[in-house]
């Protein structure tokens, strides 16, 4: 917003980005970049997290909003999440307690802060995982202006529609106000 934000923004990034692989599980702190986690999974031949490799952002934010792309979502891989409640209590929530839906979760609704998460993946073929990640990166590049600073995907997809199609149909593709512009790519 041009008017700022009335509240506190907490960014867990440096110092909160540890990623550990144990068997088919990855435990990562909230500040770990999704690309970092995807690379760790690939190196250990773990499949199931390829969809997240090109999503900009950290694990904490991705868990809160159930981030997803190209048919995968965080709810598909989360085993448990450790959070800080509004009362200052540290709790570990199991996947079935998270009520994850399209770009929402019980964590979001409760206003909890994600501290870490355990992801459950499967053994796979390292070369196939690498190829899938490259395929998804190519698809992302063809639909998003990666060479420019971006706020990322802004609109939630209305049920039965794609935001990109609605933007194009409404004539807003390329629309610009000051230095902000709706992408030419969708």
Give the location of each predicted region.
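Gly/Ser/Thr-rich helix-start
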Residues: 1, 8, 32, 54-62, ...
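N-terminal glycine-rich flavin-associated loop
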Residues: 1-4, 8-46, 73-92, 121
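Solvent-exposed alpha-helices and their adjacent loops that cap or buttress functional pockets
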Residues: 1-3, 18-21, 41-44, 56, ...
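Generic secondary-structure boundary signal with a strong preference for alpha-helix termini
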Residues: 7, 43, 66-73, 80, ...
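Short, low-complexity, polar/charged sequence segments that are solvent-exposed and flexible
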Residues: 9-11, 27-31, 45-49, 68-71, ...
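Fold-independent oxyanion-binding glycine-rich loops
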Residues: 12-15, 24, 29-33, 53-55, ...
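A gly/ser-rich beta-alpha-beta helix-loop segment of oxidoreductase catalytic cores
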Residues: 41-79, 85, 150, 154
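Phosphate/pyrophosphate- and phosphate-bearing ligand-binding catalytic cores of soluble enzymes
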Residues: 84-86, 90-186
